Amino acid sequence: YTQHCALCHGADGQGQSSGGKPVFPALWGARSFNWGAGMGDIRNAAGFIKANMPLGLGGTLTDQEAWDVATFMDSHERPQDPRFTGSVQDTRAKFHDSPDSMYGRSVNGRVLGAP
């Protein structure tokens, strides 16, 4: 992430904006995509990253680099899935029951997706 992504998306994944409009999107945190978005699935995110990132240099990362970046990115908190049922476990079972989803997993002592 530091080598290939931070220049545009920020060291803390906050993205960059100009005049109040996003230029490079936040990859995690309150202004990023929510847990229900396709990029919240590591396989989807890795495929997009491999084909399109870094900007203008799509296809230059190895498969492993794309998966590593996607896993790192999806290991951070983001806005709640709009389909949230009131229970992280139930929401994971219904909408994120995949080894490629970090939703509901514990990372650094915090359950991702917990209110």
Language-model features: where?
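Extracytoplasmic electron-transfer domains, predominantly the class I c-type cytochrome c fold
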Residues: 22-80
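Flexible coil segments in periplasmic/lumen-exposed cytochrome c-class electron-transfer proteins
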Residues: 2-6, 11, 64-67, 71-115
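Sequence/structural segment immediately N-terminal to covalent heme-attachment motifs in c-type
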Residues: 1-24, 42
